[in-house]
Amino acid sequence: MRVVIGIVIVVVALGIIYWFIQRRREWDRIGADLNMTGNVQVLDMSVSNGKAFINFAKRLTNPGKIIGVVANEKQEQRLKGLIKEAAVADRAKAVLTDVTNLSFADHCFDYVIITGLQQVKPAITRGRVLQEAVRVLAARGTLAIIDSGNMQRYEQLLEYYGIKNISVRKINGQKVIVAKRI
């Protein structure tokens, strides 16, 4: 019986490790697919655990910069710790601000990334988040929305906000809306 339990624990642990490796590859692929490298300005509007944010930061070269929007001071301190640990402080920054009223100038980011938009409640607030993303997106900038649902609604809202070049891609099994301002 102990042997069976031990085998089950090992299999579960290997499954979890495999899942984390696949997620990291997924984010690397998304960054590569968007050609997010070098001296570009990136806004990550939905930093969660910070791993994707750090992966994106590693793709940049100074003076390129990624700014991660965080919702509270605890998350801000955690992200600052990750930035320091990954040695990307020259090109990554955590900012505590409201995603429905960003504290950035118009058209200042080459890339804007939003993940987990379906978690924003109430649903009407998602439209406001997208409106702010479009506002800060530079001319010829790219907006990427990584989400598990509501893609058709997001496309409709982006068209309403004046974004015309919109495609839905599947990158490593993840649906991604890529919208380019032209």
Protein language model features and the residues they cover:
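A short SAM/SAH-binding and catalytic strip from SAM-dependent methyltransferases
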Residues: 110-124
